[in-house]
Amino acid sequence: MRTAAKATISLRARLIYPTPSNDSVAERGDTIPKIFKGLFIMKKSLLAGASALLACSPAMLMAEEGMWLPSQTGSLAADLKAAGLELDPATLGDLNRPPLTAIASLGGCSAAFLSPQGLVATNHHCVAGSLQYNSSPENDYLTNGFLAKTLGDELPAAPGSRVYVIEDLRNVTAAMLKGADKLDGRARYDRLQANRTALIEACEKQANRRCDVRAYFGGQQYWLQQQLEIKDVRLVYAPAAGVGNFGGEKDNWMWPRHTGDFSFYRAYVAPDGSSAPFAKENVPFKPKAWLPIAKDGVKDGDFIMVAGFPGTTERLRTAEEARFYYEELYPYQQRMLAEYGDRIDELTAGNQAAAIAYAATLQGVENYEKKIAGQMAGADAISLVEKKQAEEAGFRAWIKADPKREAQYGAALAELDRLIAESNAEALADAKRGMLGRGQLYGAARQLYRWANEQAKPDKDREPGYQERDRAFMTQGMQRIERRYVAEIDKALWADGIAEYRTLPADKRSAAFDAFMEGRDLASFYAATELGNTAKRMEWMGKSVADFKASSDPFIQLAVATYDEAMANEAKEKARSGTVQKARSKVMEARLAYAASQGKQMYPDANGSLRFTYGKVTGKAVDGQVWTPFTTAEGIVAKHTGRGEFDAPDKMIELIKAKDYGRYVAPELGTLPVDFLSTVDITNGNSGSSTLNARGEFVGLAFDGTIEGVVSDWMYDPKINRTIHVDSRFMLWTMEKVDGADALLAEMGVKTN
């Protein structure tokens, strides 16, 4: 059973993280992944990211620390060379040269091209949704794995799957701030959103481009990221769960690790090379570059680097925010997630079809629950809150030491402190109100009704997420429900969410929701709705507001009844966000000046944009134990039980016992490596990030961290922070010896015996 005790670190987790939504003009600060928006739908406030400005003293920056922007590579050249980089450091800042031109995003995971035929390498857990979507009790690809022997055998990925190829990154700070400098509140928010919309609209005049504007350093900088959006994504190869998820929840975030967390997609385009939806006549995409596979792997002490799209870090948050999260919000979130996971287990027990339908949801719940538990334990271990308080005290003292600085920044600091206190006071109530989103059909009804309302406006005036550019995502999101929904289970989970919401005092609850639900039972909702039928649900995408108001569907009626209240709350939040954004930008100006006064360079918090990080292969000492940097194939046999989470394929066990490793033996180990540790600095969203050696060659995939180190989202500590990578030699050996993926190996330029 899951528990919420800090010491209990159970459940599976990975580094998957949906990238920040494009509707934010501030840095992403909401720490709730999109998959949990139905569990914790907190206020859509820019405060969360805006107030993250004070901690992480630049004097504490370590050599391995940093999720660096490509534009910062010039100033890091000497450090990179000293660390062991053999490439020209300038290549790491050039989107038109490898390795960066081979790096791709999946929207929530990172990836990279490994062949000229659009073959994309990522983590096994990043393709779990596609495995689940294509699985059935008769063809259980989640359990047994999948290999397409030919291009024609490749399966469509889950609806909404994308491969994004980055084409341009440009500084648009002046354009974003035009007309906003003297504004505050809602006026400032609206101006920033209008500027953002105009920039994106201009960028997306090129067909099949997906553009967004992200804030860095608290809004001191804004950069536009332009990507080619590839819409036809197909599943090529995923090893069995006994490889890709070997060790499951028990081994998750743990070392030693023996998980082969890797899989392959392929990107397809129309015959003329343009991006197009799935069609039989489509052809493999030809990337500008792809990563070469290293002939030799890495060894202890080697320089490595990782490029990807880290989702969110909180290192620039204030000490008071850290205290609130670790003492109040995180304990509540972990308890709710633990109960949620237990409930899904209970409701799907003995029902294979239901278990398949909820597999991806459960994996995500387990992911986030364990991470929160690890963050709390890690914060205690390194005295995170106390360290942040001490660091922040130095920053504040620096401001007060100079009357000019006090006059310039003092008022903004005080305003930010006030806004943080207000936000913290409401955060737990926000989380409980968010529990109403546990029901998928209620969530679908709300989205559909919002879509209808937004469609009545000119496209440029619609809320981001509901514009014409978002139609495909909206459509595919509605389609995906079909494979992830069982009515009785949805009803039970929604009932649990409503029960938790009702623990709030009346003045904290939604008056509109309570009024509508009075005297109604949930069974009547599911008996009378047609939203569980995909075809019927999709019809609502084209209906008007009047159609919704005339509907007799109870979920639609509830969405209509609560809409005005939700919009009024959103309007207040937008006004507040504009105020926060102005204060935070000024404070961040001070923060950057403070760093410069110490001769230090800062990097911005992760926000889903392209970053690179570097470090070395190394183990560590933990509580009297020494962690060596590599695990080996023999460890798989030692852990193998033939059941549950430790059920490796029979063929793999036979090959290991026979020591049939071919040319994939690491000379210094005398055997086949499986996973390895490093000091590179990553977080959620880096799942699937290619690991490169000093020459820019592919040597593996980052897929996890150690439980002691997940606190690095808030503070990097080189003593405890370690990233776990699957070794390319284990990947290639599994493909060749276990699954017979010779055609893929040949495509990647790997010669088999």
What residue spans do the PLM features occupy?
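Short, Lys/Arg-enriched N-terminal segments with co-localized hydrophobic residues
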Residues: N22-I41
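Bacterial N-terminal signal peptides
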Residues: G49-S57
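Terminal presequence/propeptide segments associated with secretion/organelle targeting
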Residues: D30, K43-L46, P58-N753
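Low-complexity, intrinsically disordered segments with a bias for serine/threonine
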Residues: R14, V25-R28, G49
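Short helix-onset patch at the extreme N-terminus, typifying the N->h transition
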Residues: A7, L47-A50
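Short alpha-helix boundary/capping segments
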Residues: M1-L11
